[in-house]
A protein has these predicted regions:
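Terminal low-complexity interaction tails
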Residues: 188-190, 205-206
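Short S/T/G/P-rich N-terminal loop/turn motif that feeds into the first structured element of a domain
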Residues: 1-56, 60-70, 74, 83-84, ...
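Broad structural signal for hydrophobic residues in well-ordered alpha-helices, predominantly aliphatic
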Residues: 28, 80-81, 190-191
Length: 210
């Protein structure tokens, strides 16, 4: 069964006031079976724009992720952040299809993964397809694995583009290197003028720093 993901993007105006939300939500997350994949690590917005804080949280299914958002526990925590932040909050279904073919010598795995979080509005679907075909090689070369590519989604707060893609890499360095590689940049040229993209590269969550 495909996983489900919370992807909130936030701008926090009052960190001290926001902390009460964090404390309550984090305590509940420790009991609800979800897994925090990314929050608070190194990050680089490589295309478009993103809010200042970005979170990637995994649930066992899309339905569970939606139910968690509407749960009594989160409904009590949620209002605590509203006066102190602006948020675009997306819940999206995970991907369970074929993955890029891995290279013979992919990048070494690091203790913390790296992720791409991309939000896309495709303006020319037919001419966008060559980009999809061309990105498979660099994704395989750098050990990428799709977590999200299409699937059901719900925008719970704010706004978001029509498509979301999340890729997991063996490390933050591998995620950045893939984007900057000649092979990926050659693929990216193929989508220029065919899509509007906001793309973030973010380091996996490090529990030792939180």
């Amino acid at each position: 069964m495909p996983k489900g993901y919370w992807i909130p993007h936030l701008d926090v105006s009052n960190p001290q006031g926001f902390q009460a939300y964090r404390n309550m939500a984090d305590a509940w997350h420790q009991t609800n079976g979800s897994k925090l994949l990314a929050r608070g690590g190194r990050r680089e917005v490589v295309e478009g724009k993103m809010r200042g804080r970005n979170v990637l949280r995994e649930y066992d299914s899309f339905d569970l992720a939606v139910a968690a958002y509407h749960s009594p526990e989160y409904s009590r925590a949620h209002p605590l952040r509203e006066p102190h932040s602006a948020c675009d909050f997306l819940i999206v279904e995970g991907y369970d299809g074929s993955q890029p073919q891995s290279a013979d010598a992919p990048p070494a795995a690091a203790p913390l993964k790296g992720y791409w979080i991309g939000h896309v509005d495709v303006t020319d679907a037919d001419d966008y397809k060559p980009y999809i075909a061309a990105n498979k090689m660099p994704f395989g070369k750098f050990g990428a694995r799709y977590l999200v590519a299409g699937g059901r989604f719900e925008v719970k707060e704010g706004r978001q583009r029509a498509r979301t893609v999340v890729l997991e890499f063996p490390s933050y360095e591998a995620a950045l290197a893939c984007y900057r590689s000649d092979d990926y940049q050659a693929a990216a040229i193929l989508r220029k003028g065919k899509a509007e993209v906001d793309l973030l590269v973010i380091e996996g969550f490090d529990p030792s720093k939180h």
